[in-house]
Amino acid sequence: MSKTIAINAGSSSLKWQLYEMPEEKVVAKGIIERIGLKDSISTVKFDDKKDEQILDIVDHTQAVKILLEDLTKHGIIKDFNEITGVGHRVVAGGEYFKESALVDDKVVEQVEELSALAPLHNPAAAAGIRAFREILPDITSVCVFDTAFHTTMQPHTYLYPIPQKYYTDYKVRKYGAHGTSHQYVAQEAAKQLGRPLEELKLITAHVGNGVSITANYHGQSIDTSMGFTPLAGPMMGTRSGDIDPAIIPYLVANDSELEDAAAVVNMLNKQSGLLGVSGTSSDMRDIEAGLQSKDPNAVLAYNVFIDRIKKFIGQYLAVLNGADAIIFTAGMGENAPLMRQDVIAGLSWFGIELDPEKNVFGYFGDITKPDSKVKVLVIPTDEELMIARDVERLKAK
């Protein structure tokens, strides 16, 4: 029985999940946080147990060593040979990767080369890949790209209306993100609806700290809200989403704290969205508490958030010429029934009727009334499982 580990490396973290394959059984999972900082934290969960230790972990290579030591220390594996595959989540695959890829030196170089498209994510992914290759050089190593699912978009969708030389010379175009999540929940939606994915029109809404909406036609992404980078689209936890680009030079010229375009983009990525408008938090739970206390900034942040998501869903209903189902997933999508209710309330013209008894915290599946023309589903995402499946698929080749 082989084991496959799915890795999601951040700039100072390494999240992992160990599977028995092909049974798709989760054996253990964990996260290593504060890599490169004092008092790093390694957390392992297995057999209804939880182990946490405080260490000083200087880099991703040491983090991988700690991870593997934890697996043997707790008896989760007897030796490293039980792990036959590792899959790495990579945010940006650019135009190099239309599907998951077996790792070699060239693939690692290309992942690093694409760091400009995902500066917070790709360098960390490359560090995680290099660490596993150094410690376990003989296992099957696979990169799974967030952008790959969106490579089915057509030029009229992914090109920006700017001179084409910026695409031909610099590959400036829409790439999208969260593709692994969008693909997974679309597949699960088809199962729940009892229909082939190849005949469905779906709108998938990944609503977490990052937010992206995708139009899925017969199993393929035909449009998505994130763009050249994951900054585009609806309002997010700390990201602005779409804004007028002329705002950037205007702020550089008028605000002494924003010295250049990079400073503005940093502000748009890390200090905007729910956090920026509310002035207090990027967490929807805090925003909803502000609604209860009638905090005007929380009310405004919430209303902007709902408005932006609603507009993208409406846009994709037009692109698809209607939809069979709308799927909510990720942190807020799965756990914020008020948000779902208020987004769908503005779409009742399309014949969508929520069932208030089903649209509650902790309920998954169809949350509409039986006669709703468009179904609304809440489906927990599982990007790690998709990564493990791709490792198994490529191992078999």
UniProtKB/Swiss-Prot annotation:
| GO CC entries | cytoplasm
Q: Which organism is it from?
A: Streptococcus agalactiae serotype III (strain NEM316)
Supply the EC number(s): 2.7.2.1
- Active site location: 146 (proton donor/acceptor)
Q: What is this protein called?
A: Acetate kinase
Q: Quote the subunit structure annotation.
A: Homodimer.
Cofactor info, note text: Mg(2+). Can also accept Mn(2+).
Upper classification of the source organism reads: Bacteria, Bacillati, Bacillota, Bacilli, Lactobacillales
Family named by the database record: Belongs to the acetokinase family.
- Gene Ontology molecular function terms on file: acetate kinase activity; ATP binding; magnesium ion binding
Subcellular location as annotated: Cytoplasm
- The residues the record assigns to binding ATP are 15, 206-210, 283-285, 331-335
Main location as per UniProt: cytoplasm
Q: Keywords of this protein's UniProt record, alphabetized?
A: ATP-binding, Cytoplasm, Kinase, Magnesium, Metal-binding, Nucleotide-binding, Transferase
Its GO biological process annotations read:
acetate metabolic process; acetyl-CoA biosynthetic process
